[in-house]
C-alpha cells in the first residue's frame, strides 16, 4: 500500500500510531531476549578471561576467587548481604588460616612498619618478584598525624594503641589486642567476613617479619601513631 503525503494532517495520527506500535514491539522483543543473571555472569567471566593475560610476575590466576571472596562478591552484586550465620562460618574458616609469629614475638620495629605502610610497591607487572612488597596502608587509613595524604576507606588508625589502653604491648592485659591486631593484618576476613581490607599475610602481600613491623607501628608506645 502506497501512502499519500499530500495531506500532512490526515496521515499524522496514522504515523504516530505506527511509531508507537514499533516501540512496543521493540520493547517486548528486548524483554524477551534479555539474558538472565546466570547468563550475564557467564558473559562477564568470558570478558574477564579474554581481557587479561600473564605479564611479568603477574598471573591471571589472581582473578580466581576463593569461597570467601566469591560469596562476598555475589552479595555485593545482588544487594543481598551474607547471612550472619554464613558470615560467622567465613570468619571462622579464615581465622584458621592465620599464621601466628613463629618466634612468639608480635611487635617489630615501628620505623620499618612506617616504611611498609608508606610503600605501595610490589605485585605489579613492572615489579621484580624478588623485591619486598609494601603494605600501602595509607591508601585506606590515616595512621600518623605527620602524614596528611591518606585514604578514608578504612577507619583512622591514629592513636590505635593508645585509645585501646596498650601501654605495655608485652603485658598480659594487652595480649587480646596484640593478637587481634596481628590476626587482622594477616587475614582481615577472620574478623569481618566481607572486609575490604587486603588479607596481607594470607595473600602473601606481606611476610611474617613485615607484619611484625606493622604491628609495632600500631602498638608500640614509642611509635608516632600513639603520640
Feature map (PLM): residue ranges:
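Generic anion/oxyanion-binding catalytic loop in active/binding sites
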Residues: 101-102, 126, 200-203
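Bacterial N-terminal signal peptides that target proteins for export
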Residues: 2-20
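Residue-level signal for alpha-helical transmembrane segments in multi-pass membrane proteins
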Residues: 24-28, 145-148
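Secretory-pathway/luminal and periplasmic proteins that interact with or process carbohydrate-rich
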Residues: 123-126, 146-150, 224-225
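Post-cleavage N-terminal segment of exported redox proteins
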Residues: 2-5, 25-123, 184, 217-227
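Local sequence-structure signature of Cys/Sec-based thiol-disulfide redox active-site neighborhoods
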Residues: 125-136
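Extracytoplasmic electron-transfer domains, predominantly the class I c-type cytochrome c fold
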Residues: 43, 48-51, 108-112, 138-209, ...
Amino acid at each position: 500500500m502506497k501512502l499519500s503525503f499530500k495531506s500532512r494532517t490526515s496521515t499524522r495520527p496514522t504515523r504516530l500510531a505506527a511509531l508507537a506500535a514499533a516501540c512496543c514491539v521493540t520493547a517486548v522483543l528486548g524483554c524477551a531476549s534479555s539474558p538472565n543473571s546466570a547468563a550475564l555472569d557467564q558473559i562477564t567471566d568470558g570478558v574477564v578471561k579474554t581481557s587479561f593475560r600473564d605479564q611479568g610476575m603477574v598471573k591471571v590466576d589472581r582473578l580466581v576467587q576463593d569461597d570467601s571472596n566469591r560469596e562476598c562478591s555475589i552479595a555485593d552484586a545482588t544487594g543481598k548481604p551474607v547471612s550472619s550465620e554464613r558470615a560467622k562460618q567465613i570468619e571462622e574458616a579464615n581465622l584458621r588460616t592465620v599464621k601466628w609469629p613463629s618466634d612468639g614475638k608480635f611487635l617489630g620495629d615501628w620505623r620499618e612498619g612506617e616504611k611498609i605502610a608508606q610503600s605501595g610497591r610490589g605485585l605489579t607487572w613492572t615489579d621484580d618478584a624478588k623485591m619486598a612488597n609494601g603494605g600501602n596502608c595509607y591508601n585506606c587509613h590515616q595512621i600518623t598525624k605527620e602524614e596528611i595524604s591518606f585514604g578514608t576507606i578504612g577507619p583512622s588508625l591514629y592513636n590505635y594503641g593508645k585509645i585501646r589502653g596498650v601501654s605495655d604491648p608485652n603485658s598480659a592485659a594487652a595480649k587480646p589486642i596484640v593478637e587481634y591486631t596481628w590476626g587482622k593484618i594477616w587475614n582481615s576476613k577472620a574478623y569481618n567476613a566481607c572486609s575490604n581490607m587486603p588479607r596481607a599475610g594470607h595473600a602473601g602481600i606481606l611476610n611474617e617479619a613485615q607484619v611484625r613491623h606493622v604491628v609495632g607501628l600500631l602498638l608500640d608506645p614509642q611509635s608516632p601513631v600513639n603520640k
